[in-house]
Amino acid sequence: MPRIRTHHAGDLSRDDPRAGPLKSFLVHEIQSEDGSFEGISGPFGQWNRRLEPTATGINQIIDYRSQLPHWGWLVDLASRVALPRLLARNQASTWGPSDLLSHRQASLLCRCATLSLIAGFLGGLISNTLAFLAKDFGETAAAQANALAIIRIGTLVTMIGTALADRLGRRRMLLGSLYLASVAALVTAVAPSMQVVTIAQLVGRGSVAVSAFVIPIICVEEMPKRSRSFAIGVLALPAGLGVGMVLWFLPILDVSQGAWRAMFLVGFALILATRYAGKDLTETRRFVVADHLEPTHHHPKVHPGRFVAIGMTLLLLNVFAAPTQQLQNDYLLEERDFSASRVALFLLLTNTWGFIGVLGGSQIADRWSRKWAAGLGIAGLTLGNTLMFNATGWPMWVASTVGSVVGAMSISSIGALLPELFPTKRRGLANGTLQLLAVAGSVAGLYLVRDRIDTIGYGPTTRLIASFPLLALIPLCFLPETSGQSLEALNDEELPELGSTTVEDEDLGLDEPAIHPIDPTALN
């Protein structure tokens, strides 16, 4: 069991939070009969803290274990570094959640993080291999744009899947969508033509999009109200890692034109990984309660003003984001004469730092304003990506990095707004329908640039579409501020079995101990 030992010179003052049972954002304690402090609530599976007087002061000894699935080792490692400082200050971490997470919530977040990684890999396959795939089939940049536009029609799959999540449950549709996307990857691996690839990825990308909407819904429905953007930001990191893992394999595409097929065969492993990661994932309690209400119970409807405002934001943003992100590899290969290895290096070095924007944006969104975080991110994404397509040499690398870091600030804020703005039994359908507007923007953007790329080039074309995401800031201003508000209060929703219309973590019925008792023999 991990152990942290710190020394405090002299006695602890009465005002020092460590002198008694802690009640902080990290852990809630009670004092045991032997004088030590046992954790009763918090993200740790086991927690024991005791103070031992010495000749020169006080030794604080903490025995803990997160016991979290899949990522517990990382949490334990980070805790060893951060816990002594954070407990001494008794303040929330600059980069951590603003609320105390229960062990159940932390476990769910870890399971969703693994599923996000799988979804990220599946989603990144076609976008990062399309240029090589099209070259193997002898297709042009215009044909790639056409294929991407057709693949976007998979939003119909997304809308159906998210709507079913309101009826059949979040868990069932999340796992089912990842299974279907993995099968689509296997079909792509053996596809005889570009047309078959397009059809397979139409289904695959639509299924990945289902998971991309359902995972945030699960987390927003389970997390405390001041930590929802934090949770979305945390999930964005393994999703980005999944996309980055695709880049690890790009150098093998230099071996032969058909080497891209090997990357899609990973679908076999992802089916097994999905089964492993999802076996202990539970349904959200908000969905369970809402699903068991009497048929006569009134479920709030979607607020039309909110739907239009967030929908127009997504549409205008994607007119720019889809072409610049999807055709970036082709630009580097054709315009800058990069090899597959150099493309992978460029994307890794410029995109890896996006985690800074994700974490920073989530803190702004939770502690200040969702709309400010989203606005800053959209502006940074537009500026950075436009400059990247209009620069050469090191300025191109810097511009791409700026676009990745600042642009990532919008991920956790928009990702939280999408579930927050709609009631429980309408949340999936509303998000799936919004995907139609986002895809409409993507298709419009891809068709706008399709012919212009071959005639006027990438630089002038990106400057032409750069105004659209800036226009997206206008409808964003009309959205309500959701930071720090309960989902029930935001949507005028009553879930009687949860206790009130301002549901907090403790109101959701934690019917199991958040922290398990520590075996005293394990402390020796």
For each predicted feature, which ranges?
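Central cavity-lining transmembrane alpha-helices of secondary-active solute carriers
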Residues: 148-163, 212, 348-360
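Helix-breaking motifs and short loop linkers at transmembrane-helix boundaries and internal kinks
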Residues: 138, 169, 190-195, 224, ...
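Cytoplasmic helix-loop-helix junction between adjacent transmembrane helices
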Residues: 200-235
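Extracytoplasmic gate region of multi-pass secondary transporters
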Residues: 126-131, 305-358
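Symmetry-related core transmembrane helices of the 12-TM Major Facilitator Superfamily/SLC fold
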Residues: 260-276, 461-478
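Structural signature of the two symmetry-related core transmembrane helices
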Residues: 172-186, 372-387
